[in-house]
UniProtKB/Swiss-Prot annotation:
Cited function: With S4 and S5 plays an important role in translational accuracy. Interacts with and stabilizes bases of the 16S rRNA that are involved in tRNA selection in the A site and with the mRNA backbone. Located at the interface of the 30S and 50S subunits, it traverses the body of the 30S subunit contacting proteins on the other side and probably holding the rRNA structure together. The combined cluster of proteins S8, S12 and S17 appears to hold together the shoulder and platform of the 30S subunit.
Subunit note: Part of the 30S ribosomal subunit. Contacts proteins S8 and S17. May interact with IF1 in the 30S initiation complex.
Name of the gene: rpsL
HAMAP family for this protein: Ribosomal_uS12_B
CDD domains: Ribosomal_S12
GO molecular function terms attached to this record: rRNA binding; structural constituent of ribosome; tRNA binding
Biased composition (Basic residues): 113-123
Species this chain originates from: Synechococcus sp. (strain JA-2-3B'a(2-13))
Family: Belongs to the universal ribosomal protein uS12 family.
Record-level GO BP terms: translation
Keywords noted in UniProt: Methylation, Ribonucleoprotein, Ribosomal protein, RNA-binding, rRNA-binding, tRNA-binding
Compositionally biased tracts (Low complexity): 124-135
Protein name: Small ribosomal subunit protein uS12
InterPro entries attached to this UniProt entry: NA-bd_OB-fold (IPR012340), Ribosomal_uS12 (IPR006032), Ribosomal_uS12_bac (IPR005679)
Modified residue annotations for 3-methylthioaspartic acid: D89
Length: 135
């Protein structure tokens, strides 16, 4: 415990907060160009082929970003928008690609949670494409 004289001489330093998404540089989103689109496997105990992309951002960083949703149209040189948000079972993936903006198309036939996947509202007159339950 410091004395009052020591505190007068040198005040307490506040611990600096470390950001979880440094490549965004305090912006909510960033634009970037895909340099590589590939699949990778998650940590134990999960098993899948997760779709990810290596993205070179306008901030100068090159990061790995997750492509959410079923199916995508991204390839090398696609221009995408990324946001923060890690994927718990993919080490090193700290960003998500925003679907439905720039070159990343929205998820097809998405009925619920559409805003998170850039899907347009389905027309009310259309018959349901994949009716789950039938009585």
């Amino acid at each position: 415990m410091p004395t009052i004289q020591q505190l007068i001489r040198e005040e307490r330093s506040v611990a600096a907060r470390k950001t979880k998404s440094p490549a965004l540089k305090a912006c909510p989103q960033r634009r970037g160009v895909c340099t590589r689109v590939y699949t990778t496997t998650p940590k134990k105990p999960n098993s899948a082929l997760r779709k990810v992309a290596r993205v070179r951002l306008t901030s100068g960083f090159e990061v790995t970003a997750y492509i959410p949703g079923i199916g995508h149209n991204l390839q090398e040189h696609s221009v995408v928008m990324i946001r923060g948000g890690r994927v718990k079972d993919l080490p090193g993936v700290r960003y998500h690609i925003i679907r439905g903006t720039l070159d990343a198309a929205g998820v097809k036939d998405r009925k619920q949670g559409r805003s998170k996947y850039g899907a347009k509202r389905p027309k009310p007159g259309q018959a349901p494409a994949a009716a789950g339950k039938k009585k």
